[in-house]
Amino acid sequence: TSWSTTVPATVNVSAGLGLISQLSPLAQDYYRPLITDPNLLNNAELLTKKLAWAGGLVVAISAIFNGLGRLFWARLSDTFGRKAIFGTMFATQAVIYILVAMGILSNYWVFMVAACYLLSCYGGGFATMPAFAADNFGPGYIGKVYGFMLTAWACAGILGPLVFAKFKAQSLYIAAILLIIGLVIDLLFKRRERKTA
């Protein structure tokens, strides 16, 4: 398979898994300003537990949308086309990552909604890729082509969390840049003549 299929898969997964790796700490940072109870603020143990609960809640709810996104985006791609849906996912994710990085979506509850959307795109990309491979290379080649895509997926599983951990302050901007690269490739992608097995 070509870079035009493996790179978009890589950037989508890098952004998604990178976010997942830092989702709880980010949510806890956004929840902290909402705590006004003196009993919590003056008790480090209770405060830690409350923040952990807030982080866990975002992780749990967004995980549900990760699963739902696999159904939702795959269904939309059947109607509007794989390329259009991938372009939509890349563009909207890039915008949201930038807004979060700029602090515009720093409210805990707004961030929860954003996280749910971002993880729905992560799951949606995973679910839509097999159909994308079949559409462009033919059903007889889906195993080989999707194997390359999954290799890219595995590499991204290492790359994304490492980038988010090492460049924490800039990680959201880096994710947005990666997604913009994916968007450009998606826009330039031209469907190949389908092969038969």
Feature annotation, model-predicted:
Residues 25, 130-136:
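Intracellular helix-loop hinge segments at the cytoplasmic ends of transmembrane helices
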Residues 3, 53, 57, 84-91, ...:
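Signature of the 12-TM Major Facilitator Superfamily
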Residues 15-18, 53-132:
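C-terminal transmembrane helical hairpin of 12-TM major facilitator-type secondary transporters
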Residues 1-73, 160:
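Extracytoplasmic gate region of multi-pass secondary transporters
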Residues 9, 59, 63, 90, ...:
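Small-residue-rich transmembrane alpha-helices and their cytosolic helix-loop interfaces
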Residues 176-197:
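Multi-pass alpha-helical transporter architecture, strongest
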Residues 136-168:
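A late C-terminal transmembrane helix in Major Facilitator Superfamily
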